């Protein structure tokens, strides 16, 4: 596995896993819930493998660390975008118990986990708007550019299409 793939496994697969676990937690649609159990197992393996690789790279050469940092720079924003824009107040997937958490809550929890991890191993987060709220004790990410995702926006999809995505 190359260094770039390690960053993808560490960041993107972890975001996918968090999103899928939120669906699995309360999903009322049996066939989807059953297949998610297998998918979550697989995504968990990928995320743990990426984390293990990140730990090794953190102790590696300067060149390896620079390559991993470049991959973090490339994949940070797509990882945040994976959660989707903030959920609508009338989110049908929440109302029908297809998922358990709002997109912004999942994204917030993911940031709380991964910013400290990256910092602890000497990597930087490529978010110029990232701040730490010392009163609340949590990280606040900067604004997300949704422009690259507009062609596949959920506002243009029907419910059956969303379930297949």
Predicted regions and their residues:
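Extended, helix-rich structural scaffolds rather than catalytic motifs
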Residues: 65-157
């Amino acid at each position: 596995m190359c260094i770039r793939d390690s960053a993808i496994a560490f960041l993107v697969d972890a975001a996918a896993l968090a999103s899928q676990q939120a669906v699995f937690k309360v999903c009322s649609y049996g066939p989807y819930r059953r297949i998610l159990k297998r998918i979550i197992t697989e995504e968990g393996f990928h995320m743990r493998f990426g984390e293990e690789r990140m730990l090794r790279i953190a102790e590696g050469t300067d060149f390896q660390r620079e390559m991993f940092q470049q991959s973090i720079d490339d994949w940070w924003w797509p990882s945040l975008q994976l959660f989707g824009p903030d959920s609508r107040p009338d989110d049908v997937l929440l109302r029908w118990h297809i998922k358990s958490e709002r997109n912004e809550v999942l994204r917030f929890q993911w940031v709380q986990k991964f910013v400290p991890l990256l910092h602890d191993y000497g990597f930087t987060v490529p978010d110029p708007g990232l701040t730490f709220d010392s009163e609340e004790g949590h990280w606040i990410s900067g604004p997300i550019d949704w422009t690259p995702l507009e062609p596949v926006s959920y506002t243009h999809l029907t419910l059956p299409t969303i379930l297949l995505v």
